Amino acid sequence: GLGDVYKRQDINLSREAIEETESNYALLEAEEIHALIKPRNTFSHKGNFGHALLIAGSYGMAGASILAARACMRSGVGLLTVHAPIRNNDILQISVPEAIIESDASDTYFACPTDTDDYQAVGIGPGIGRSEETEAALLEQLSGCQTPLVLDADALNILANHRHALTTLPKGSILTPHPKELERMVGKCQNSYERLMKACELARTAKVHIILKGAYSAIITPSGKCYFNSTGNPGMATAGSGDVLT
């Protein structure tokens, strides 16, 4: 494995040499993350912060769509539309009253692709299941989508059987697999180093960003550059964490 703990240690190398040396690997720290958060203008409104679409949930898995929708709202999105099967509509409307609920034609699962032109980002996957109808709907949804995507959970499991679709995703798209979901797409790995290398190769070939989730999540760019997020903790090892991270 890659070890249990990542730390930056000063071993008295030349500071100038370190700053001039190129590396594809970097450890993110709190001050670097804080610098990425843009301050909000006093006179801003919800239209300034984008409209996202979330395609999530199936009958018996409404919780996945609720958790993902709540997390999306808390992340600061201006507007959120949730596309869900009819039988999940009531609980979604009650649990996430801020969201706009769009009904799928199916009572129980994602079966009908929806237009994405009016959105700035589209998330697909939490709790959608892997029925034949959902598989067909996902592939059709991806084939015509020009909006950046965040693909997770069952969306990735479906794509593992249709790897050609990974190379046609819109620019700026993000895949957020946990280790097993990644291995379904790239093949079994003997250790975490091999898994990281295969994730970097997938990011380059598919021209997508990949967040390989774990205690030290690896954020991989389409160029293959890798940033490690050290803020994970064992408290996240519980049902629903992945849906929130989407």
Q: PLM features: what roles do these ranges have?
A:
Residues 4-149, 157-175, 179-246:
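Small-residue (G/A/S/T)-rich helix-start motifs and N-terminal tracts that mark the onset
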